[in-house]
Amino acid sequence: MSGIVPEIPGEQAPPDAAHQLKVDVARLLQKPKLNFPGAQPVSFARKHIEEELFKRDYYVCEKSDGLRCLMYVTWENNPDTGPQQVTYLITRNNEFFFIPMVHFPSNDGKPLQDTIVDGELVLTKAEPRSLHFLMFDCLACNKILLTGRPLDKRLGYLNAAISHPLKEYLHKNPEVARDFPFSVRVKDMQFAYNVMNVFASFPHLPHITDGLIFTCRDHPYVSGTDERILKWKKQDENSVDFLMTMKFPIFEDTNGESWTDYDAKPEITLLVWTGRDGSRPYGELYLTDEEWDNLKALEEPLEERVVECIKDDKKRWRYLRFRDDKTNANYITTVEKVIDSIDDPVSEKNLLDAAPKIKELWKERNRRPRDEDRKRVGGDDHDHGAKRARQ
């Protein structure tokens, strides 16, 4: 099930200001390029159970159906009031949106600054709908670069330096909380072997969820595609984002005059992104007459729009929704991995069946360092005792 992509409750920064913000973010993250610095998951394949979940420690959380954003908290000089804290949301298109009426204190009582958090903006399912920003990673906190640290450490900063001070501040200042354009909280993270708890939480979540995200516990934060962030979806919900182009039928009347019939159902070609070579055709979108009528009724531009598609039981690509938060289709290798997940799916039962072994191997991995520490401590004590005996 897919929901409505939420709109960002803020004003987009103009090009000149956005460029400077990109420079500031790149400097903070020590990155040479000004592109979107967020990590992107890969589709969960059957091999990932044995090659990843059995061999490495992973956290798992629900995959929210919303708008992926980075939150950037910094300081800007106001000519009237002097330096003040400002907050931006950064989209996957690397657009910066100024978010008014928010304030983030840090754990030393001072306003937070030079901080970048990874998260998702979601809408609640029930009316009246409200916005929530769900945080799940931290790239930088109060000028401290965290991308090279393991997930455990990054989550520690996210909770101790961002989430907890904010909770206390809003508890003491409820009138400020009412002005926030969205609530802010940390996503619930579970050890991978507790995946059953995450599945059990789905019916109780206030927002739509469409899968799971597994993130490696001892892995650094990687900008771009990260092979150690695994996105799992049910087979019938695995989707691909294509760029669609339309070819309308041409009719010729008895007088030999021809015209394009823009009311008739067109042939719709689905394109994937290849990088330097741009977009190339990958397949066709199947639409029923009713679906075409519904699209026409939107009275919106349709040509060269990014569309999220799923495969039906007849292997046809079907329309799910438009993704206006994206300018490009999925990269060709991403599409191929999603196709692999569709053709050789990992079911919920497969993950639940694997959980006991994931736990067994997790415990074994984490028991080894403690055993080695005990051996070292025992050896040290023995050496110290020998020295005392000789004295």
Curated annotation (Swiss-Prot):
GO terms for molecular function: ATP binding; GTP binding; mRNA guanylyltransferase activity; RNA polymerase II C-terminal domain binding. Residues 363-391 are annotated as: Disordered. It catalyses: a 5'-end diphospho-ribonucleoside in mRNA + GTP + H(+) = a 5'-end (5'-triphosphoguanosine)-ribonucleoside in mRNA + diphosphate. Second step of mRNA capping. Transfer of the GMP moiety of GTP to the 5'-end of RNA via an enzyme-GMP covalent reaction intermediate. Its main location: nucleus. One of its GO terms (biological process) is 7-methylguanosine mRNA capping. PANTHER family: MRNA-CAPPING ENZYME (PTHR10367:SF17). Heterodimer. The mRNA-capping enzyme is composed of two separate chains alpha and beta, respectively a mRNA guanylyltransferase and an mRNA 5'-triphosphate monophosphatase. CDD domains: Adenylation_mRNA_capping (cd07895). Its EC number is 2.7.7.50. It comes from Yarrowia lipolytica (strain CLIB 122 / E 150) (Yeast). Belongs to the eukaryotic GTase family. The gene is CEG1. Signal peptide: none annotated. GO terms for cellular component: mRNA capping enzyme complex. It comes from the Eukaryota. Disulfide bonds: none annotated. This is mRNA-capping enzyme subunit alpha. It is found in: Nucleus. InterPro entries: mRNA_cap_enzyme_adenylation, mRNA_cap_enzyme_alpha, mRNA_cap_enzyme_C, mRNA_Capping_Enz/RNA_Phosphat, NA-bd_OB-fold. The active site is at K63. Keywords: GTP-binding, mRNA capping, mRNA processing, Nucleotide-binding, Nucleotidyltransferase, Nucleus, Transferase.
